Amino acid sequence: MITVSVCMIVRDEEAVIRRCLSCVRSFADEIIVVDTGSKDQTASVCKEMGAKVYDLPWQDDFAAARNYAFSKAACDYQFWLDADDVISEADQEKMKELKETLDESVSVVMMRYEMQHAEHESPVVFERERCCGKRIILMERK
């Protein structure tokens, strides 16, 4: 069975981080949180929920911060999320199944990503951005 590190970069996310971390605890083998300068209790909440928290001064470079998070991950695959992301119970079960069945020769798994939407609007679904991959390194386009 594969192992999964959930990697996040955060700043002042105390209001939403607990909800996000609650969603990933069922399948994450480790949770890596890189805090880029929170003034609230984000880091404390993350530690309380079992995450490994690293401080990194913000350098105006998302790729550098995300790559730093990936460098701290020890598992086979890295899965990145934003602090306001929520994973449904059904998708949590799919992640558990994926961990048990994924052929280890697979390098990257792309997942559907539904953006938040108002009740009267249709959701926007992307085949992007929520990857689970082996030692992923991101590069921002400039």
Mark where each language-model region is.
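Extreme N-terminal starter segment of soluble prokaryotic enzymes
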Residues: 1-5
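Short, well-formed alpha-helical segments that are part of the catalytic scaffolds
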Residues: 8-30
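A conserved acidic beta->alpha catalytic loop
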Residues: 23, 35-47, 58, 82
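Conserved beta-strand positions in the Rossmann-like core of class I SAM-dependent methyltransferases
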Residues: 32-35, 54
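Conserved donor nucleotide-binding strand/loop of the catalytic core
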Residues: 43-68, 72
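Acidic metal-phosphate-binding loop of nucleotide-sugar-dependent transferases
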Residues: 60, 77, 81-88
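Catalytic-site signature of metal-activated, phosphate-bearing donor transferases
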Residues: 64-70, 76, 88-142
